[in-house]
Amino acid sequence: MEIVPISSVELPIVSALSRKIWPISYKDIISEEQIDYMLNKMYALEALQDNVQKGHRFALIHTGGEAMGFCSFEVHFPDPGISKLHKLYVLPNQHHQGMGSALLSYAVQEAKKDQCHTIFLQVNKKNPAIAFYQKKGFTIKEEAVFDIGQGFVMDDFIMHMSW
């Protein structure tokens, strides 16, 4: 298992992985229409490139030379000392093999290197990953509903972890 930071050149891999992961991971949480809308809005190559231009850092996790998942995070966002974990996904057939934990540890270590003391994330209130994040030390700080257009919303918990 190897985690590799990537540049814009490898973003098509992230886009392709998201299209394999999302329909399975979110099928019992949001509608198929919302999954398609969010993939097209947030994981199109142009959207991912825009993320990089805004300061998001992406990394892939590989095993056997093949990409199995990814994360993205931003340091000193929205304030100095705070980091936001924007994305953390692993192929469903690779769950429970330590890859999500490794990606999360990578993002936290990178945040620490940049003098951050807190990392936060948004997660759908119905997402079973909440238990994973709680096990890793995150706590629910607030709830928020975000209008993402076309009549869709993200109904999320905001979770934080500090060190």
PLM regions: where:
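Conserved catalytic-core motifs of GNAT/GCN5-like acyltransferases
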Residues: 120-124, 134, 139-157
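Short coil/turn segments at alpha/beta junctions that flank glycine-rich nucleotide-binding fingerprints
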Residues: 97, 114-117
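Residues forming the Rossmann-fold NAD(P)(H) cofactor-binding site
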Residues: 101
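Conserved hydrophobic/aromatic "anchor" residues
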Residues: 70, 94, 132-133, 138
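Extreme N-terminal starter segment of soluble prokaryotic enzymes
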Residues: 1-3
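Acetyl-CoA-dependent GNAT
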Residues: 5-11, 15-93, 104-106, 110, ...
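Active-site acidic-Proline motif in GNAT/NAT acetyltransferases
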Residues: 91-93, 97, 125
